[in-house]
């Protein structure tokens, strides 16, 4: 299922939300309508938590996470950290990191198994990332852009890349991530994919300007038409067994 939403008339909803398979963070402030869209789709399966990071509402660009953990920049306050620890499932590890590239969501893209990171990301951050999120880490660019977290979105089912990504890069990234990838846009032609949408294994949210053509590409590559939460555990088990055999 792919749903359209906006945050205070802003269609860059990927800036104001962070969605994974075990939790969803939504920025404080904004209209109730924005939360109700997320809560309507998610509240029966995962917690939808109001949060800020370092006093900012652009939480989607500030943090990076998956079902195993959440990484936030060092300027996240103790109160914000405690609130997230209290609100998220106990299985989710939350870690503050000292990183020069502090908008972690712009420089890291990940699913539950693999992370793509900015070529200049600190080595220590890379190690923490691999440990906290339990992912394999690759330094990459997308369409020659270093902000890998901004120019793609991917789940354990598929991924959407910057429209100028070459076929060779698509094939390389697809083999690293082990999921099908396509190039595309959101919000009627925006190349900044991750700012315009958030996605997990059964649900996607896109900016209100996203066209029906863009939505159908998203529903197709992320396999959302036949996905619902109860099938996720089964498919996760299958993929885990595949990776072990």
UniProtKB/Swiss-Prot annotation:
<dbReference type="InterPro" id="IPR002769">
    <property type="entry name" value="eIF6"/>
</dbReference>
<protein>
    <recommendedName>
        <fullName>Eukaryotic translation initiation factor 6</fullName>
    </recommendedName>
</protein>
<dbReference type="GO" id="GO:0000460">
    <property type="term" value="P:maturation of 5.8S rRNA"/>
</dbReference>
<dbReference type="GO" id="GO:1902626">
    <property type="term" value="P:assembly of large subunit precursor of preribosome"/>
</dbReference>
<dbReference type="GO" id="GO:0003743">
    <property type="term" value="F:translation initiation factor activity"/>
</dbReference>
<dbReference type="GO" id="GO:0005730">
    <property type="term" value="C:nucleolus"/>
</dbReference>
<dbReference type="GO" id="GO:0005829">
    <property type="term" value="C:cytosol"/>
</dbReference>
<keyword id="KW-0648">Protein biosynthesis</keyword>
<comment type="similarity">
    <text>Belongs to the eIF-6 family.</text>
</comment>
<keyword id="KW-0690">Ribosome biogenesis</keyword>
<comment type="subunit">
    <text>Monomer. Associates with the 60S ribosomal subunit.</text>
</comment>
<dbReference type="GO" id="GO:0000054">
    <property type="term" value="P:ribosomal subunit export from nucleus"/>
</dbReference>
<dbReference type="GO" id="GO:0005634">
    <property type="term" value="C:nucleus"/>
</dbReference>
<dbReference type="GO" id="GO:0043023">
    <property type="term" value="F:ribosomal large subunit binding"/>
</dbReference>
<keyword id="KW-0396">Initiation factor</keyword>
<dbReference type="GO" id="GO:0000470">
    <property type="term" value="P:maturation of LSU-rRNA"/>
</dbReference>
<dbReference type="Pfam" id="PF01912">
    <property type="entry name" value="eIF-6"/>
</dbReference>
<keyword id="KW-0539">Nucleus</keyword>
<comment type="function">
    <text>Binds to the 60S ribosomal subunit and prevents its association with the 40S ribosomal subunit to form the 80S initiation complex in the cytoplasm. May also be involved in ribosome biogenesis.</text>
</comment>
<keyword id="KW-0963">Cytoplasm</keyword>
<dbReference type="GO" id="GO:0042256">
    <property type="term" value="P:cytosolic ribosome assembly"/>
</dbReference>
């Amino acid at each position: 299922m792919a749903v359209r939403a906006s945050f205070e008339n802003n269609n860059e909803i990927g800036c104001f939300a962070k969605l994974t398979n075990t939790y969803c963070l939504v920025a404080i402030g904004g209209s109730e309508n924005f939360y109700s869209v997320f809560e309507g789709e998610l509240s029966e399966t995962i917690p939808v938590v109001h949060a800020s990071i370092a006093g900012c509402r652009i939480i989607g660009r500030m943090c990076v996470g998956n079902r195993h953990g959440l990484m936030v920049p060092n300027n996240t306050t103790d109160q914000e950290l405690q609130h997230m620890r209290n609100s998220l499932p106990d299985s989710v590890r939350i870690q503050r990191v000292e990183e020069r590239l502090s908008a972690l969501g712009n420089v890291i893209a990940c699913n539950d198994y693999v992370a793509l990171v900015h070529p200049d990301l600190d080595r220590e951050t890379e190690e923490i990332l691999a440990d906290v999120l339990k992912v394999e880490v690759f330094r990459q660019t997308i369409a020659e852009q270093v902000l890998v977290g901004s120019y793609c979105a991917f789940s354990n089912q598929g991924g959407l890349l910057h429209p100028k990504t070459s076929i060779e890069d698509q094939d390389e990234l697809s083999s690293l991530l082990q999921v099908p990838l396509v190039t595309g846009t959101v919000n009627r032609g925006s190349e900044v994919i991750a700012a315009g949408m958030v996605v997990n294994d059964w649900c996607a949210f896109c900016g209100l300007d996203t066209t029906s053509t863009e939505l159908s590409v998203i529903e197709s590559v992320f396999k959302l038409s036949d996905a619902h939460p109860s099938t996720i555990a089964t498919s996760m088990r299958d993929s885990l067994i595949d990776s072990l055999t």
